């Protein structure tokens, strides 16, 4: 009986592995690099927008991929005269505008007008978003949360900007905020470089 059970188990494992192997062989990966159109091969952020475009943020520009070809774009606000090409975070809001986090703050891309606008805003206390952005997310009530490790966490809503100092300046190098999670119940959690988490 034990011998028959052992043989059946071995046959099951062999046939299962063959089925898994056949399923895996149907995948095909195509590589997109600097050699075939990407502005730079160090990709730091990826998002698919509601139009179906794939966006790749690199150390040297923003790239839009339609499944066939790549269009290289620069985050240049020609009205203000600022720009940045080191892309670190991407997010699409409810108005279908792309938020682009760079190492000098946030830009918004309006696809209808095909323009970038620098988010040169300040909180009521005079704090502005002017450093490297690690993450951008939204919650269910329309707040957009922006994590800037060198500063803290910002919340944007109704054309106003609010600032949350996650940790005090003494511990900022080891406790700088880096990632953020908005739970379905609305709670906002921030993770730091030092391994701590905070609820806002």
Predicted segments, located by residue:
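Carboxylate-rich, polar loop motifs that coordinate divalent cations or form catalytic acidic clusters
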Residues: 1-200
